[in-house]
């Protein structure tokens, strides 16, 4: 049994623990510590605000889509889920360049609305899939019982469906928020200099600025945020009894 555990454990240590340790060591060097300043904080706040907007839009769009898929027959569910996943098979650069042709006539190209639209399009599947899993598990008899007791469809939705799908909502929000916060390809291609985000700055220090310590410091901030949000999610699951 121990021999079966060793390969995946070695993989995690080699490709996760060791790189993270190297990043942490470089982050606390002199060049790395210089990045913990007001400019970095302002960029983090700006990127967090953009990530929140994208996450909320993905939730607003993704919830009814996931509910519609969950209400379809098994055959149509497979077809619709395939359509949700298909965009992920396309390279992000190719997909983003194709979006330019749609955004330019609207005047959204090289503007923040275009960046948000591109990010929503790219990360919407990561919201739909966990929501679909949660909605599929909601017992229909509970909704019928709520309506039999006099609840309107809207009241039954907010009182029954939403609480039962909180795990999917939380998982979808984390799966969207964290990657958007660290994204750089879509903001750079669709927004230019007006849409520099936290991930763009990390990419700049590693690839253009050739300052691994500065890039490591910013990366460490992203890692810390990821761990904090993941820890908060599991804590909520425990305290609220989410399953």
Where would I find each of the regions flagged by the language model?
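Glycine/proline-centered hinge or cleavage motifs at structural transition points of membrane proteins
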Residues: 149-150, 163
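Short cytosolic juxtamembrane segments of multi-pass membrane proteins
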Residues: 236-243
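Membrane-water interface segments at the C-terminal ends of transmembrane alpha-helices
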Residues: 1-29, 38-136, 162-184, 189-191, ...
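Append "Primarily bacterial transcriptional regulators
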Residues: 145-146
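Short glycine/proline-centered loop/turn elements that form peptide/ligand docking sites
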Residues: 138-142
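Short alpha-helical segment immediately N-terminal to, or the first helix within
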Residues: 33-34, 134-135, 159, 204-205
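Glycine-rich helix-loop "coupling/hinge" segments at transmembrane-helix boundaries
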Residues: 184-212
